[in-house]
Swiss-Prot record:
This is Uncharacterized HTH-type transcriptional regulator YmfC. GO terms for molecular function: DNA binding; DNA-binding transcription factor activity. Pfam families: GntR, UTRA. It comes from Bacillus subtilis (strain 168). Gene3D superfamilies: Chorismate lyase-like, Winged helix-like DNA-binding domain superfamily/Winged helix DNA-binding domain. Signal peptide: none annotated. The gene is ymfC.
Amino acid sequence: MSTKADNRHLYLKVIERIKEDIKNGIYTEKEKLPSEFELSKKLGVSRATLREALRILEEEHVIIRRHGVGTFVHSKPLFLSGIEQLNSVTKMIEQANMTPGTIFLSSQVLMPSEDDTKRFHLAEGQELFYLERVRTADGQPIVYCIDKIPMNILPNSFSHQQESMFDLLEKNSGSVISYAVTDIEPIGYHDTISPVLECDPETALLLLKQTHYDQHDKPVLYSLNYFRADKFRFHVLRKRF
C-alpha cells in the first residue's frame, strides 16, 4: 500500500506505517528490513524521505542500523523503570512477572582502593566484602553486578545467597537502604561483560554506578550494575521548580 494519499508530511506517514508493520508482525524483532530501494518502492516514497523516517525511528529505538549490514527491528525492552524510584534488581525482575535468579562468579574480602576509602569513610586497615555475580530473569542473563560492602557493618559469619543485596544488608547488618546517588554511563561492547550477558556485538550496555545510603545517611553499599540496553529502559520524572 502506498502512502501517497495521506496529506501529512511523507516521512511521518512512513514512520507510522513501519511501526504498524512491526506491531502487526510483518517485521519481527531483530529481523532485517528490506533494502532502502525495496522499501521506498513499496511505500511509494523517495529514498530521501525514507532515510529521514529511518533516522527518527532509530532515535526512538524502534530500529537499529548496522553500517554495511542493514537495518533491523530493535528488540523491545523487557523492563521499564523510573530511575527516580530505587528498587533492587530482584524487585525489578519480579515486577516484570519474571523469576529472578543469580549466577555467582566470585566473592572475596579485599583492601579498599583510595576511592573506596573516601566513599565509605573507612579507617586504616578496614576491609571490603566484594561480590561479583550475574542476575537472570527466567534464566536469561540481563545484569552484571559488582557490589562492595564495608566488612565492619557485617557479622563475622553471614550468607550472601540472598537474591537481593538490600535484603542481605537488612538481615545481616540492620541497614535499610533509603536512597542512592547514581551516575549513569552508556557504554558499548565490553570484552569481558558483554559475552557473559550473551550480548550481540552491537548491543550496548548501560552502567549504573550507585552509592547506597542507609536510614542514618551512612554509605553502606557501592554497586556497579551493567544492564543490557536492549532489555532495560529507564526514564526520569523531572519537575519544574
